[in-house]
Amino acid sequence: MLAGVAATAQTKTVDHFTKVIVSPYIQATFVEGTEESVTIDNIKVDESKLHIEVNNQTLRIYLDGAKDYPKYEKDNSNGYEGSHPLYQNRSVVVTVTYRVLTDLSLRGEETHLCKSAITATTFTLKIYGESDVTFNELNAQELETTIYGEAELNLKAGTVKDQQYTCYGEGRINSESITGNTSRIIAYGDADLTLNVSDRIKITAYGDAKLHYKGDPEIVKGLHFGDMQIEKIN
């Protein structure tokens, strides 16, 4: 396929996986289905640069030279030394069809959507960079979320009994539309969280974290340095 030329979406069947790692410059939508696959909806680079691999039940989708983090290359075209991204944002758009999904790692600045309702005992989510991540519905006993950077996470429906959030940087989390019992927050930086739990929230903050919450949970303050703000909302 030629880079930048529109074509009919291609679907690749893959081995069984329960965990997905999506690398920078790739935008993904996740849907539940009966057969596990990756559909390439749009691609702006040479297809040979795209890798879709499954090892130890982990699906990895990445581009050459940008497997883990965004990469830059030197540019002297204007008479002075500079750099530009190795690829454009949204160089690849994919749809991932899963049967079981328990672990998700997203890297870069793309927008990602978990379109189908996800049900798991424990769901682990890691976000690196400035991604915008939305779950239409998540139901789990426990959610373990770690955000590195300025990413935004929105949970639109569901029930997660125990919610654990660790934020490094200025991440924004909105789980107001899901219900839960307890939450534990550790924030390094200026994270902003909006939660809806019934029993207990414990927050530890190193920086100017903000917590907005619905319901009447017990608020437990751990160590905190900086201007931590806590607000009850209707």
Positions of predicted regions on the chain:
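Short, surface-exposed interaction patches in beta-rich subdomains
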Residues: 153-234
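Sec/Tat signal peptide C-region and signal peptidase I cleavage site
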Residues: 5-9
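Acidic (Asp/Glu) and glycine-rich low-complexity loops/linkers
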Residues: 10-126, 137-146, 156-163, 228-234
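Short beta-strands and strand-coil junctions in structured, solvent-facing domains, enriched
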Residues: 28, 112-113, 132-133, 152-153, ...
